[in-house]
Structures are given as structure tokens and as C-alpha cells.
Amino acid sequence: MAESINSFDSKSTLQVGEKSYDYFALDAVPGMEKLPYSLKVLGENLLRNEDGKNITREHIEAIANWDPSAEPNFEIQFTPARVIMQDFTGVACIVDLATIRDAVVALGGDADDVNPLNPAEMVIDHSVIIEAFGDSDALEKNVEIEYQRNDERYKFLRWGTGAFENFRVVPPGTGIVHQVNIEYLARSVFDNNGLAYPDTCVGTDSHTTMENGLGILGWGVGGIEAEAAMLGQPISMLIPRVVGFKLTGEIPTGVTATDVVLTITDMLRQHGVVGKFVEFYGKGVGELPLANRATIGNMSPEFGSTAAMFPIDEETVKYLELTGRDQETLERVEAYAKAQGMWLDPEKEVEYSEYLELDLSTVVPSIAGPKRPQDRIELNDSKAQFRKDLHNYVEADASAVTPDFDAEGPATENTSAQTAGTPASAADAKGNIPSAAAGAEGRPSNPVTVNYNGEDIELDHGMVAIASITSCTNTSNPSVMVGAGLLARNAAAKGLKSAPWVKTSMAPGSQVVNGYYEKAGLWKDLEAMGFYLVGYGCTTCIGNSGPLPEEISAGINEGDLAATAVLSGNRNFEGRINPDVKMNYLASPILVIAYAIAGTMDFDFETQPLGQDQDGNDVFLKDIWPSTEDIEEVIASSITKDLYAEDYANVFEGDERWRSLDVPSGKTFDWDPKSTYIRKAPYFDGMSKEPEAVNDVKGARVLALLGDSVTTDHISPASTIKPGTPAAQYLDANGVERKDYNSLGARRGNHEVMVRGTFANIRLQNQLLDGVSGGYTRDFTQEGGPQSFIYDAAMNYQKENTPLVVLGGKEYGTGSSRDWAAKGTLLLGVKAVIAESFERIHRSNLIGMGVVPLQFPEGESWKSLGIEGTETFDIEGIEELNNGSTPKTVKVTATKENGEKIEFDAVTRIDTPGEADYYRNGGILQFVLRNMMSGK
């Protein structure tokens, strides 16, 4: 760490017990004391890294004099203390760093000059896929398959730990990066050779914001931005607006942390917080356990905010103590936070840019779906809302709507509590077989009978095909995890079980969960419901749900059924969870089990029983719902500091499989030209020491014409590779058998696979084509512009030197911090993306890869302008960047085949001078490499 020039003379000494620390005192700068917590962290960051060049006295004064009402317009340079990665994005990062070493050597430099300057830590959590489930061997089977599939990748990462300084890897089978981060990796307040400063951390996963619950400022960035941060490049940003979110009251009985976070997500999405910090304050904050704060922080990308901060307080220190941090750390965190005015004072209200308020006592049980996290549904309305939404997923003539009718004849023994004509449960027998079509009156229904596990069962629209307790969002939270275990216990005691067509799974975010489940004796109850341990990793939440049983999959496809998934995750975008599933719902772990028992989303927990007990009595959800007292009692008796200490004692060592990997050595990597997993990246091929001039775009064609809320999943899916697609064709040509395709996410170290998988999501709707889903476009290099794979068309355009553009709607690039969504866009030959609005990370990633993001004029869209996608595009004004200034707008001309022109001024979304530098250099990594070679 370079020495600060300390122009405010702010360096001071903090005495904590017998130990003293240097620190940069905020009170040396007038105005810092009145700032929100998150801006105080930024202020300290600038004080400590002031170098008189990138960070000057003017930058520090700009933070201190922050105007809450102003729109962001002042650029600062944020220097994170560390970087975390997951393996899907992380492998690509290490491939890029290894490639940069090669480029440095080729330009006459030393490979040793390329190293992370601050801690860079990776947790391998994205590679485990749920192949096996429903039995006690599932974990071992899935781990074994994971190692077989990922041998090359894991050897490469082991090489990286030996080749690079400051780089460590948490091996597979340990947990999920964000949960491991808050439970172990997070420092809260650093002690760097006697210098104390706040832990700040960016990560190559958008849910890095989980650490915000611990008072750590950070957020998800693209892999390319993370690589630059590792190499010492500060992150360019505008001083943001800060939304104050006041919490009052207490969470009522029967309401979970998941319900709270879905409510907050709904509120903040409606309010609009893209590009802003959200900061929680008020007396209600003190009532929230740290795990609940982490759950809320985790969902920041779903709100759209950059960060969702909770200041440090007693609850923070209690959590650090529970998770095994030493006494010196606890004392340092508390003393530092109090000395810097960063300790939460519930009575004090600072000035924010905007305000929202939630009385926690008003929160009700909720789920979200069927395709966005912000689509919150109150549980009482879930059946009615499902029936409304179902019509969007079922062809009008593909399924008959079963008419409503009153049952005739006398009531049978177990129908007393039911609506007339409605079975006790969707999993009840219909025609003496378990049926997901039970109670289908009034909605589309298309029953399909299959034989599974020796039993005839009936599938239908709304069937819960997947019920998965997954994701760090919820598995880090003991209240909902213990609650799920107790609900399973109560259900088992009543003789209930999951519907036979449901693929059930339990994938905790750390081994600590296994520890307290064992201690509380809850595993046998969870397993009775089918929820066996399948792995420690992201699994279903990122689309690694694994295949459905063949019979179930065949039945769903035969009937073109709108099957559903219920998961305790953070994202439910279309096409993300499983290719056989059309509708995805987020729910608490407790409700995941409840829906597994119900077997269908077409279910009203208030009026419909889940089944009958041994005496034939109806059992409703309320009858098995665990009490708050029971949950707290299990937590108090089962979760101890020793559990965390034991599970994290040897966190970097791994199992015998990891330790026995045959690891290559050397400062530079010996690339295998036959590898289909790890290939040298092409971004520096032919790169000169000086950047070339940027050019206007002339004669471009539209590669994709897209609507609103196109996610980075749509652009660069992480899902399994579909046979027959360009990515599969490449693997076939390289001798890879279909069973070994693995997922696109697992192959992010190979650009040849990834460029072929760009815009290849099976749910992508390219509106250049009518009624076609998937990675297709029209290829205007051929007569009549026939339908073609997007990759094939892009390669034809490249042969003719025709540049490409992509047109989008609102919230383009929402979702994961997936740098391959930008890398793949570049490698396809796209020069510009024009959309109505961009999500923060993807906009930044596009610039970081040398693709210009442009925005339609306010209130306009490609549709309103009359653009059809068959036009050729010219973009004038980009060349102004060569003169050192960024044009506010550029002129776009779309010329139709008949010569008619559509002209408009698009807003240039290169928002800071730093981003302009990246774009002029062809990308952020080229900028960093050129600076490295010139000694800057």
C-alpha cells in the first residue's frame, strides 16, 4: 500500500487495550461527521489512498461536502481492500491474469510484475450440479462427478495459487463464497502492519453485497474490473446518492427473514435505486439479527442498488464473536467504529438523498415469481396469482380449461374443510394415483400420466418439479434453516411427505449448517421429506439443479407443461433454474418444504390441507408451522462458536481429491491447445504499446432486437449446453462426448465455447424473429435474411467486416455480474448496445471490454422510433473521444432498405473520465497493461 500524502494531517493513533493502531481520522476533515455511514467508509478510503494524482484533496473535500439532493456528477477512485471470486467468473479472471503475464513477457516485461496487490480469494462453489438426490449417498456422488468434470479447471486453479502472490482458493465442497466470506474471510476492520482501516471488498459475483450486512462496503463487479482492482487499479465511480431506509417495529410471529427481504425488494424496485447506495437506519435495525441483515444485503442486486449497508453495532460484534473471530479483532472493530463515528446510533438520523420506511410488524408471508425477484406475491394470494400468470405460459389451445363445478353427491370423509370440488391436497389421489391435476377446475389443465419409481403419477401445469433449499441468501440464516428443519419434523410426525414428482434437495452455504442440523437431530426429519444433503455450493440457485428424472422430464415435455420450481434463492429469471421448468418462485426454506408437500403452485395454504394425519384428520400448514420459541430454542442449544472454529480450521486445505491433483508449475501457464476448458484469452492479441484511435460505427447490422429486463443470464447463460447448438458443435468437433459437455458456466475459461454460447439462452426472445425462442437471429449476409444461430450469423458478418449493434429495452443487463455477457458481446463483433436503460454492472462491463453503451432518448425506444431491426446503422460522434472529451450524445442513423432514415441522438453512457480512458484503450485490461508497461 502506497503511503498517503495526508494533506489533511489526518493520520492518528488509536489505542485499543495494550495495542495501538495508526488510522486516518475522519474528524480531521470538516463535514465528514455528518455523512451517512457508507460515505464515511468512502471518505476514509480516499484519505488513506490520497496520492495527489488519482486521489487528491479535491476528491476528499467533495465527499465531505456531499450534497444529498444533488445528482451524481463527481468522479472518485475507490480502492477496495480485497477481492473475492467464485469459480465460474474466477477461472476466467485467472485465465486473464495468466494471459496478461504472457503479454507482459511478450512486450519485454517480467511475469512477476503481474500479481494481486491485495488479498484475492476464491471459493469454488459454482461447479457442483445436483445429479444425485433423494438418498444419503447424494453428496458423495455429486462431489465425485464434480471432480471428474472439472479436473482441468481445478488443476489450473491449483497452479494459480502457487504462481500468484496474494491469491488463495477455498476448495470445492466447503460452501458458498458469500457465506464463507461473512463467516470467515471478512475482516470488518483490517490490521495491516499496525494500520487500521475498514474492510472493503468487491467480488466477481453480484451478491457480494451480502457483506454489507456486516458493515463492509462492497459490491459485485465484472471479472475484468475485479482483475484490474487486483492489479492495483482503483474503481472509478461517481459519488452516489444514498437512500435512507428506516426500519421500525419487529418481525411478527410466522414471518421470516425471506418475507422481509422480498418486501424490501418490492419496495426498492418500485422506488428506483439503480446506481444508488441504500443505507438502513432506525430502531428496527437493532432488532434485526446479523443473519437477517446479511440476507437483505445479499439481495441488493435484486433491488438494483449498488450496496445495501448496515452500520456496525453490538450485533455485528456478537456475530463476529460467534463465528470465531479472535478477541483482538472484536475489540479493534468496536473501538475503530466508535472512533470514526461509524458505530450505529439508532436515535441519530443523518441526511439522506431519499427516504423510505418499513414497519417490520406489517410484513406478511410472501413468495416471488414467476420470473423476477421483485414480483412479490402475498402467500394468501399465491394460488390466485399463479392462475393469472399461468395463462402466460400455456398456449391458448394447448390445454383445456377445466370448468368450475360444484361436486355432486354426499361429501366424503375428508372434504369438510374444503371448497366444494377441491381435493384436500394437490398431491391427493385422482383416480387412485397421486395427481398434480387435482383441483384443476377453473385453470388450464393437461394431465400426463407417467410411471416413476414403480408408481403411476399424474403431472400437470403448476406441478412443483423442483423444491430446493439452496443459496447463501437463506442458508446463511439459522432462523429459516432451523425453521425448515422443524417444519419437516412436524410434517413427518403427521405422516406427510413430499409429492412423488418433486426433485428435492438441500445444499447449504457452509458446513456449519450440517453441524447444527446434526446437533439438533433434524437431518432425519428433513430426509423424511426428501431433503437430503446434495452438496455445499450454489446448485439450483444458479441453474445447477441437474436433470429431472427422465420419466418426469419426458412427461413435462410430452404435455408441454408449465412446470414450476420453488427455491430459497435470490434469482428466478426465465430459463435460469432448469430447462424443463417454465415458472420459478423464490420462497423461504420453510415454504420450500411446504410446497414440496403440496406438490403444486396451484395451492391455497389457508383453505387447503396438505394431507391427513394417521387418524385421518386434515393437516394444514398452520398445524406444522414451527413457533418462534421453538426455533430460538434450537438455535441457542445447537449453534456455537465451536462449530465455526471447527469447520474453518483448515478451510484452504481441501479433501484428498483436491490435495492429490497433479499441479503444473511455472510463472507462466503452459497452455494446452487441446484443452476445451482452459484457453489463452484473445484480448491482447496484436496489442500495441499505444492505443489506436476509436472510430465511429458505419454500416452496422442488428444482431439482436430485444425487449425489457434482458438479463445477463439471457446474454451469457451458465446453464447446461444444449446438443446441436454452436457450443455443442464445437465440443463435438473437439471429441467431447455429450455426457461431458458440462455447463457454459464451467467452461468460462475457454472463449471458443463462451462466444458460441453468447445470447444462447433458451428463453431469449430475439424480436427479429416471430415466435422463436433461443439463440437465433436473421442473417442479412444471406438473401432474404434467413433464420440462423446468432454465432453463425456473427461470424458471417465478421467475414464481411460488418460491425454489429444490439438493441434493447429497459433494465438491459440486469442480474449477475457476468463479465462474459460483455466479453461474448465483444467477440461476436458488437460495437455498441443501444438500450432504454442499463443495469450498473453490465454497463460498466461493456465499457471494460471496449463496447460502447448508448441510451435511447428519454421516453423513446426502438419500437416507438419505428425501428424493425432490418436497418443498417451509422453512429457518429464516438471519435470525439480521441480528443480527450466524451460526447454527451452521439448521432444514430438507421437506414431502411427503401432508403428511409430514422435519426436520433443517443446518450453516451460512458459516465466518468476513467471509463473514457478504458474505452479509448479498447478495454480496462488493456489500459492497466499499458500503464504497467509504462511504469505508471
From Swiss-Prot:
Q: Which domain of life is it from?
A: Bacteria
The UniProt annotation puts the region (Disordered) at: 401-449
* UniProt KW Transmembrane helix keyword: no
GO MF term list: 2-methylisocitrate dehydratase activity; 4 iron, 4 sulfur cluster binding; aconitate hydratase activity; metal ion binding; mRNA 3'-UTR binding; mRNA binding
Q: Which biological process terms from the Gene Ontology are attached to this UniProt entry? A: propionate metabolic process, methylcitrate cycle; tricarboxylic acid cycle
Pathway it works in? Carbohydrate metabolism; tricarboxylic acid cycle; isocitrate from oxaloacetate: step 2/2; Organic acid metabolism; propanoate degradation
Q: Which reaction does it catalyse?
A: citrate = D-threo-isocitrate; (2S,3R)-3-hydroxybutane-1,2,3-tricarboxylate = 2-methyl-cis-aconitate + H2O
Signal peptide residues on this chain, from the entry's feature table: none
Query: What cofactors does the UniProt entry give for this protein?
Result: [4Fe-4S] cluster
Checking InterPro entries in the record gives:
AcnA_IRP_Swivel, Acnase/IPM_dHydase_lsu_aba_1/3, Acoase/IPM_deHydtase_lsu_aba, Aconitase/3IPM_dehydase_swvl, Aconitase/IRP2, Aconitase_4Fe-4S_BS, Aconitase_4Fe-4S_dom, AconitaseA/IPMdHydase_ssu_swvl
What task does this protein carry out? Involved in the catabolism of short chain fatty acids (SCFA) via the tricarboxylic acid (TCA)(acetyl degradation route) and probably via the 2-methylcitrate cycle I (propionate degradation route). Catalyzes the reversible isomerization of citrate to isocitrate via cis-aconitate. Could catalyze the hydration of 2-methyl-cis-aconitate to yield (2R,3S)-2-methylisocitrate. The apo form of AcnA functions as a RNA-binding regulatory protein.
Q: What does the sequence similarity comment in the record state about its family? A: Belongs to the aconitase/IPM isomerase family.
Q: What is this protein called?
A: Aconitate hydratase A
Which source organism? Corynebacterium jeikeium (strain K411)
